[in-house]
Amino acid sequence: MSGHGAPEIDLTTLNPAETSQLKLAIVAASWHTQIMDGLLDGALRAAKDAGISEPTVLRVPGSFELPVAAARLAKHFDAVVALGVVIRGGTPHFEYVCEAATMGLTDVSVNTGVPVGFGVLTCDTEQQGLDRAGLPGSKEDKGHEAVTAALATAVTLKQYS
């Protein structure tokens, strides 16, 4: 599994007084409902673990729309998390959407200084998405990981603002 070697970021090691004060937005695509539901559940669980009881959640049609929504949200939030699923088909569309989402979200983060957690699954098969969605039987929980990374980065950056 590609998650081998990933850092272990434990939200409980962060100061709850810091994380609970952060304003968090989650923007989630709508394709591949079962996988997206798992990603969003994991993201909301991570927010709750960090003391953020009600993050703002915005739904968009697909992963291609994530960057523009994240850019708008970054104007009002301390951290943004983007969740989506792109599964390879028989055309180059997969590469175009994956690159646009990845580069767009990177641009949002770099240009605004707001951490954008990358929870976009780019999979060859639906099973790969299910394995990473945080569902019962999944090997990974990428929604939880994306929120954890965004909040840990936001706390770190606040030390230098």
Curated annotation (Swiss-Prot):
CC per GO annotation: cytosol; riboflavin synthase complex
Residue positions binding 5-amino-6-(D-ribitylamino)uracil: W31, S63, F64, E65, V85, V86, I87, F118
Keyword presence, Methyltransferase: no
Active-site residues, Swiss-Prot/TrEMBL: H93
Superkingdom classification of source: Bacteria
Alphabetized UniProt keyword annotations: Riboflavin biosynthesis, Transferase
First-level EC class: transferase
Binding site for (2S)-2-hydroxy-3-oxobutyl phosphate: G90, T91, R132
EC number(s) stated in the UniProt entry for this protein: 2.5.1.78
Swiss-Prot/TrEMBL catalytic activity: (2S)-2-hydroxy-3-oxobutyl phosphate + 5-amino-6-(D-ribitylamino)uracil = 6,7-dimethyl-8-(1-D-ribityl)lumazine + phosphate + 2 H2O + H(+)
GO biological process, one term: riboflavin biosynthetic process
MF term (GO), any: 6,7-dimethyl-8-ribityllumazine synthase activity
Pfam families attached to this UniProt entry: DMRL_synthase
Family matches, as InterPro entries: LS, LS/RS, LS/RS_sf
Pathway: Cofactor biosynthesis; riboflavin biosynthesis; riboflavin from 2-hydroxy-3-oxobutyl phosphate and 5-amino-6-(D-ribitylamino)uracil: step 1/2
NCBIfam families: lumazine-synth (TIGR00114)
Function: Catalyzes the formation of 6,7-dimethyl-8-ribityllumazine by condensation of 5-amino-6-(D-ribitylamino)uracil with 3,4-dihydroxy-2-butanone 4-phosphate. This is the penultimate step in the biosynthesis of riboflavin.
Protein family (similarity comment): Belongs to the DMRL synthase family.
Protein name per its UniProtKB record: 6,7-dimethyl-8-ribityllumazine synthase
Gene that encodes the chain: ribH
